[in-house]
Amino acid sequence: MTTNTVSRKVAWLRVVTLAVAAFIFNTTEFVPVGLLSDIAQSFHMQTAQVGIMLTIYAWVVALMSLPFMLMTSQVERRKLLICLFVVFIASHVLSFLSWSFTVLVISRIGVAFAHAIFWSITASLAIRMAPAGKRAQALSLIATGTALAMVLGLPLGRIVGQYFGWRMTFFAIGIGALVTLLCLIKLLPLLPSEHSGSLKSLPLLFRRPALMSIYLLTVVVVTAHYTAYSYIEPFVQNIAGFSANFATALLLLLGGAGIIGSVIFGKLGNQYASALVSTAIALLLVCLALLLPAANSEIHLGVLSIFWGIAMMIIGLGMQVKVLALAPDATDVAMALFSGIFNIGIGAGALVGNQVSLHWSMSMIGYVGAVPAFAALIWSIIIFRRWPVTLEEQTQ
């Protein structure tokens, strides 16, 4: 076995470790979607009231991503990952012990703090540790961790919550994070901060219209997605009239389809990212517009969820690739902004879905989400024609 072979295997193992970490972080972000009813019952609240926790979490991440990234810009990355995992684990212990909804929200804010730092550095670390010529595949592997959070983490968290209580779901995530932390300590080398940028990077980034256009596209399309996705569980049960088990299966199917999207992007993203993203946004638009009509059939909803999951994974990967390509001199700052903007979209979508459900009808969340999806489609066509260069090649 050659040294080069060993090095490539070690490199992939490190990327896999980051992908597992991504799975852990995204599981805890997504899992409340499947636990809203149980948490609401525990604290004698309405489901829509508990749902505001999703917006609080997302907007804390959005608000703190850039400040935390700047504060830690010179910190060695292995040490930083260890510290943020400690905060992450401690916050989940507090979630397990929560004696009131306020305490639960406080614990989730602690998780959001760790999240804010994690996603501002993970994509650039994955690219940095990937074998030569395999950077797009490394990003796809990280995205696969995200998809597995939906296909395995969210349904398993929901099942644990149903049988053992929602507190045990958060405790189990904390245990998983502890195991992941031990793996990080064992496998990761010292990772001095590189190309992290600083506050001085912001004016330079803001003067890049292509990058700003990608940020705007991101917040609009994520808002569209989360307007419907945040309340997909009660939609399936209360509007479509299907069972709780089918709701779990639908979440499983949507997440699994995300893995398909990750594979597609890994194979075609190097050459066709712009076309893939615009096509995926169009697919998302169709899925949202057909959500209510599809609610009359389990098969229709199942097929729709497959295309929905594929679309969102391609969109997420495409946005990351373009951000990294447009800011190679300040990747951490650019990704901190991306993480913050992405979470603005999550919070906005969850809030819109909340308000539609409370003051109009939950049956309308798909139609309402389709409005920003249509705007995102038009914007993507405009900006990809304005900047037609195959940006993703710059990250190779």
Curated annotation (Swiss-Prot):
Ranges in a coiled coil: none
Topology within the bilayer: Multi-pass membrane protein
This protein's UniProt keywords: Cell inner membrane, Cell membrane, Membrane, Sugar transport, Transmembrane, Transmembrane helix, Transport
InterPro entries, per database record: MFS, MFS_dom, MFS_Efflux_Transporters, MFS_trans_sf, Sugar_effux_transptr_put
GO molecular function: carbohydrate transmembrane transporter activity
PROSITE patterns hit by this protein: MFS (PS50850)
Pfam family, one: MFS_1
Family: Belongs to the major facilitator superfamily. SotB (TC 2.A.1.2) family.
NCBIfam families in UniProt: PRK03545.1 (NF002921)
Record's protein name: Probable sugar efflux transporter
Organism of this sequence: Shigella flexneri
Gene: sotB
